[in-house]
């Protein structure tokens, strides 16, 4: 029998380990999305001026808000949900309900569209890591 999709090994994904209590949504608590937001911040903080999880806007089990200032000094409020990340405001802690911005699967994709300086910083960091690996491989 042939299928049109590729099977996914869920054991490599966080929270889907065999026997894990987090399989499905039972047992998850309201801090899960906030923890995810904190991980997003830690991942790309090196490539922006400022980025932090909002303390003013409410976090829930299905949504968290992240404030980011790009190297170009543009400020955004981002919404993080199961659908991904999207811009919901153009100032810290600001949600503009009328905005219909697209969702991005990753913070990298979103910042890549917002900030050429992010793209450059990310590329430079990647190049430095590759050069370090090359040096380590030659020793």
Swiss-Prot record:
Say if the entry is tagged with keyword Cell cycle.
no
Give the UniProt subcellular location, in the record's own words: Cytoplasm; Nucleus
Tell me a GO biological process for this protein: positive regulation of canonical Wnt signaling pathway
- SUPFAM superfamilies attached here? Hypothetical protein c14orf129, hspc210
Which UniProt keywords are present, listed alphabetically?
Cytoplasm, Nucleus
Q: What are the boundaries of the region Interaction with GSK3B and acts as a GSK3B inhibitor?
A: 115-139
Q: Where is this region: Required for PRKAR2A interaction?
A: 41-45
What domain of life does the UniProt record list for this protein's source? Eukaryota
PTM comment: Phosphorylated by GSK3B.
Note one Pfam family from the annotation.
Answer: GSKIP_dom
Listed GO CC annotations: cytoplasm; nucleus
Q: What does this protein do?
A: A-kinase anchoring protein for GSK3B and PKA that regulates or facilitates their kinase activity towards their targets. The ternary complex enhances Wnt-induced signaling by facilitating the GSK3B- and PKA-induced phosphorylation of beta-catenin leading to beta-catenin degradation and stabilization respectively. Upon cAMP activation, the ternary complex contributes to neuroprotection against oxidative stress-induced apoptosis by facilitating the PKA-induced phosphorylation of DML1 and PKA-induced inactivation of GSK3B.
How does this polypeptide assemble, per the annotation?
Forms a complex composed of PRKAR2A or PRKAR2B, GSK3B and GSKIP through GSKIP interaction; facilitates PKA-induced phosphorylation of GSK3B leading to GSK3B inactivation; recruits DNM1L through GSK3B for PKA-mediated phosphorylation of DNM1L; promotes beta-catenin degradation through GSK3B-induced phosphorylation of beta-catenin; stabilizes beta-catenin and enhances Wnt-induced signaling through PKA-induced phosphorylation of beta-catenin. Interacts with GSK3B; induces GSK3B-mediated phosphorylation of GSKIP and inhibits GSK3B kinase activity.
Which protein, by its recorded name, is this?
GSK3B-interacting protein
Provenance organism: Rattus norvegicus
